[in-house]
Amino acid sequence: MLTDLRFALRQLAKTPGLTLVAIISLAVGVGSIVTVLCWTRHLVQRPLPGVADQQELVMLVSNQGGGNVSIPDLSDFVAQAGVFTGALVFMPTPASLEIERQAEWTNAQVISANAFELLGVKPILGRTFLPDEDRKPGGNPVVIISERLWRRRFASDPSVIGRVVDLNRHSFTVVGVAPETFVGTMAPTLTDVWAPASMIWEVRNQSTQFLTQRPWRGWLNLARLRPGVSLAEAQAAVETVNARLTQDHADTNRDVRHRVVSLAGCPWSAAAVLGPVLQLLLAVCGGVLLIVAANITSLLLARAIDRRKEIAIRLAAGANRVRILRQLLTESIVLSLVGGAAGVLLARWAVDALPLL
């Protein structure tokens, strides 16, 4: 076998142009399809980079308010369903961020004070929000910034904690820096600034009624299931609370129903946003790989035709047909392995080039 391998390498070296074209073609074909498969797997299994135990995260969706929920309703589900360890609410918004008189547009969120703890995200500098920082409307002008923003606008200065920035013309104090891996709760959209939910008026110019009123269903949310609780069990518990809320709050919840969806099934998740695009890319890459395979087959057939004289001489000299076929097969295997390995390296580079994965 080792002799066949050395012979295959010598034969491939005799036609460097054909060999190089075949390897590059295979690398592109294999690399593209492996890249898309890796992206798809990551989006389904880990749609929120930097978040711990994502398989336990779900979203409650209502049949009103565009699918969003109210804080009182969500609090009742957590307290009464018995299947959640906690939940958070958030609202995304584009915001004007001004640092040292230099303004830019950025993606911001108002979010529950318990969000970072619930998601298992620990700051690399400073702290997360305190439990009471989303209770008093407008009373806690503090923010946590992303590692990207910290690096880009503050040159990774560790003394950033305590600095004041202007968000939509309101002053906020930086109390923490999120880790690099955490991009927010709406990946693939990158969030750079988080403020407590109590600052909804200052950040989003929206009524503080969203903080306390049951009919004000404007919040996106994430809830964490207790270990071992399935999606079906959670939905059954939610149905029980649905009925209770309909009875106890008939004026606001008579026609309101909530259901549980998985993290990957959230309408704003990376899987939902990019899934159709990745499926299309996967089909395109599969077609490219088939074309590559057909082209390489044609090249190898042409090469075999050119070697007819050589093979005839070897047969006339008493060479074994099986041995010749084995050597030709070894050449094809070597070519495939080298091209495939190059494709895997190309795919690894492509996956690493996408920070969300």
Predicted regions: what is each one?
Residues T15-L43, V292-A294, L337-A341:
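Short, strongly hydrophobic transmembrane alpha-helices
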Residues M59, P72-L130:
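Short amphipathic beta-strand/extended segments in non-transmembrane regions
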Residues L9-G17, V292-S336:
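Intracellular coupling helices
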Residues P94, A108-P131, N140-Q279, D352-L357:
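Mid-to-C-terminal secondary-structure elements
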Residues V28-E56, L301, A350-L357:
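Alpha-helical transmembrane segments
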Residues M1-L18, P49-D53, N63-G66, Q102-W105, ...:
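Membrane-helix entry/capping segments
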Residues T35-W39, R259, T297, S332-L357:
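Small-residue-rich transmembrane alpha-helices
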Residues T40, Q45-P94, W216-L222:
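Membrane-proximal extracellular/periplasmic loop immediately following the first transmembrane helix
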